[in-house]
Amino acid sequence: TLSANAQSLSSKDNAAIDAKVDQFLKLMEKKDYTKVLDFMYPPIFEHTSKKDMFQIFEMLEQSGIELKFKNTEVLNKQGLKTIKDTKYALIKYRFELDLPLNTDELRGYAPLLVPVLQSNFGKENVTYNKSQNLINAKGEKFLMAINDPKYSDWLFLIYDSSMRTAIEKTIPAEVNNQA
């Protein structure tokens, strides 16, 4: 249920956000983190570095784990306040992440990886299938979409607790409180 405070998004904004989210999630599935960064709202980088943004995924990839994103799906979108001609919206999406542990070395990482993923996705959303050597994580995450007149299109912030400090420094408090 949307709060009475939620702004409805115009059909034009809705379509624009859908198209951008679709591109964003496809790039995530391809693990093209460099291009994903182009979809980020630039002021966030005054408060966090680009390399920190996907650190966990890159760390896993460097250790030899072939991440597989799948079943990405937008669950809902909610318009937030418009402040100084900048529009904001909150997008909830779902995805799954498979981490095949194809070598003995990678299987040895499982006791370390599972707790890290559980702290990121919630204990109930991470399964380790030893017989298939596969860790699966299901997640529901949030993006904040921002349409700032300084930029030509909707851009995103990864809206989660790991980014809290940077978000608080980037987004007006009344928008943040509403989200």
For every predicted segment, state its role.
Residues M28, F57-E61, A145:
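Hydrophobic, Leu/Ile/Phe/Ala-enriched alpha-helical segments that form helix-helix packing faces
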Residues D22, F54-E58, E168, P172, ...:
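Generic detector of well-ordered alpha-helical segments enriched in charged/polar residues
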Residues D18, T34-Y88, Y93, L101:
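Short solvent-exposed beta->alpha transition segments
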Residues A6-K26, K30:
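Short, low-complexity N-terminal intrinsically disordered segments enriched in polar/charged residues
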Residues S10, E46-S49, D160, R164:
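Intrinsic-disorder-associated interaction segments
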Residues A6-S11, P42-P43, F121-G122:
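Short charge-dense sequence patches
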Residues K81-A179:
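Exposed beta-sheet edge and beta->alpha loop/turn motif
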Residues T1-N5:
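C-terminal segment of classical bacterial N-terminal signal peptides
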